[in-house]
Amino acid sequence: MPSVKQMKRTKNFIMVDLIEKKKAGLEHSKEEIQYLIASYTKGKIPDYQMAAWLMAVNFQGMTDAETFALVETMLLSGTTLDLSHIKHCKVDKHSTGGVGDKVSLILAPLAVAAGCVVPMISGRGLGHTGGTLDKLESIPGFNVNLSSQEFVRLVEKYGLAMGGQTEELVPADRKIYALRDVTATVNSIPLICGSILSKKIAEGIDGLVLDVKTGNGAFLADYNQSQQLAKQLKRVGENFGLQIKAVITDMNQPLG
């Protein structure tokens, strides 16, 4: 995996050409994806061009190699957490999103009570689903805007921390996540993979349980698409050394 310093030396491309390439269904090189993500995160690519590229990805998809490069580049847009000094098993659970889904709020402290350590970086509302961060912020005084140092300190003290993407932690996902929310590209399988896995790998965890929703309250209403997402999340995540278990659960009615 390249260093952040190497990422800053990414060669330049013409954004319109990259949009045309993906619109035609062609595969991006790793260098092209590095340029796209790094330049957008730094504000060098405007929202309207990034939105066009996201829509091209939404229609044409990405190969596993492209998705791996997407995850890696988003991950390296910021710092990653070093929890290697914590000897307990470090795990997390992530849901792909549904209506009324509050499982993380209950499951995380239960996992800690069972002896695990849970460093959880979550997202905000996306599409019609409510985000874990939004739910946490409804609790008076709950701070989800944690620096890397604050996040690690909470994990060390309590075995659990819950926060969001920041300027330090996966800033590329924070920007792209917000743009996907307003460009009708929330249900793109490779973009979902990039968002979820970049956050989870940045946590420094050993294992991840993925709750892939299916049904009319999920991003992917079709079971076969949900199965495809679960398989790609597992394939790409395991290439980064994560132990992953994916379960597909029904989202045809609100949870709780």
Language-model-detected regions and their locations in the chain:
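Acidic, glycine/proline-rich low-complexity segments that act as flexible tails and inter-domain linkers
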Residues: 2-100
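Glycine-rich phosphate/pyrophosphate-binding loop regions near the starts of catalytic domains
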Residues: 89-121, 181-190
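Glycine-rich anion-binding loops and their surrounding alpha/beta cores
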Residues: 10-13, 18-21, 27, 76, ...
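A glycine-rich phosphate/pyrophosphate-binding beta-strand-loop-alpha-helix module
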Residues: 31, 54, 102-152, 156, ...
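Acidic, glycine-rich active-site loops and adjacent beta-strand->loop/helix elements
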Residues: 95-97, 124-128, 214-216, 252
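Electropositive phosphate-/nucleotide-binding environments in soluble metabolic enzymes
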Residues: 12, 27-34, 44-48, 61-68, ...
